[in-house]
């Protein structure tokens, strides 16, 4: 039987992993949006 401490540790690990995945997704979105904005700004003819 697992102790409460090890259970909480596992819970924290999964939360941080979830947060990391979320942040990585957001970074990707921001990068894509920045690229689009730069292209729009730089492509004025």
Swiss-Prot record:
Instruction: List the subcellular locations.
Output: Cell membrane
Task: Give the source's domain of life in one word.
Answer: Eukaryota
> Region Required for DVL/RTFL small polypeptide activity: what ranges?
14-45
Q: Which InterPro entries does this chain map to?
A: DVL (IPR012552), DVL/RTFL_small_peptides (IPR052153)
Membrane spanning stretches: 17-33
| Gene Ontology annotations for the cellular component aspect, listed alphabetically | plasma membrane
What GO biological process term is on the record, naming one?
A: negative regulation of cell population proliferation
Tell me what topology the record assigns in the membrane: Single-pass membrane protein
Tissue expression summary: Mostly expressed in stems and, to a lower extent, in roots and leaves.
Q: Which UniProt keywords apply?
A: Cell membrane, Developmental protein, Membrane, Transmembrane, Transmembrane helix
- Give the main location: membrane
State the family named in the UniProt similarity comment for this chain: Belongs to the DVL/RTFL small polypeptides family.
According to its UniProt entry, what is the function of this protein?
Small polypeptide acting as a regulatory molecule which coordinates cellular responses required for differentiation, growth and development, including leaves shape, pedicule elongation, inflorescence organization and fruit maturation, probably by restricting polar cell proliferation in lateral organs and coordinating socket cell recruitment and differentiation at trichome sites.
| UniProt xrefs under PANTHER family | OS01G0525701 PROTEIN, SMALL POLYPEPTIDE DEVIL 1-RELATED
What's this protein's name?
Answer: Small polypeptide DEVIL 2
Question: Species name for this entry?
Answer: Arabidopsis thaliana
Q: Which gene encodes it?
A: DVL2
């Amino acid at each position: 039987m697992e102790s409460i401490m090890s259970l909480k540790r596992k819970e924290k690990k999964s939360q941080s992993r979830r947060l990391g995945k979320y942040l990585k997704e957001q970074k990707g979105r921001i990068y894509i949006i920045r690229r689009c904005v730069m292209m729009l700004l730089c492509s004025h003819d």
